[in-house]
């Protein structure tokens, strides 16, 4: 047979706990304030260009929209357009920057594959690539060491004249 125990009721426990503790009151505005540090990036709005008026030289670029309050970024919000080849250059420069700065723990994933098919300008293929680039850039920009220490990342995301 189990020995009998006396239990405090929930209200008694809650009353005794709350009466001895001072709680910080949060207002509705405080709860929904901007986070202390944030970086939001989205790859969106693909646009296919016909520079010579025909299929030769066609390319698609993507808008990169950024909102941040991180001190390493010069603008709180920005919008730039980038081609796939710009992403390739960015990845190459980022790897070089990491090698020179002794950050061996940071590995940069491969970009989504290059599209070599004749239907590379179809809406479905462009959307698939956009999603892949969005996921890839989010993983790169989401790394804390890159957010705070990569000048190449900042230039790629915010400088409209990014050339490497």
UniProtKB/Swiss-Prot annotation:
It comes from the Eukaryota. It is a peripheral membrane protein. Its main location: cytoplasm. PROSITE patterns: PX. GO terms for biological process: endocytic recycling; late endosome to Golgi transport; protein transport. Residues 40-163 form the PX domain. It is found in: Cytoplasm; Golgi apparatus membrane; Prevacuolar compartment membrane. Signal peptide: none annotated. Belongs to the sorting nexin family. Required for retention of late Golgi membrane proteins. Component of the retrieval machinery that functions by direct interaction with the cytosolic tails of certain TGN membrane proteins during the sorting/budding process at the prevacuolar compartment. Binds phosphatidylinositol 3-phosphate (PtdIns(P3)). This is Sorting nexin-3. It comes from Kluyveromyces lactis (strain ATCC 8585 / CBS 2359 / DSM 70799 / NBRC 1267 / NRRL Y-1140 / WM37) (Yeast). The lineage of its organism: Eukaryota, Fungi, Dikarya, Ascomycota, Saccharomycotina. The gene is SNX3.
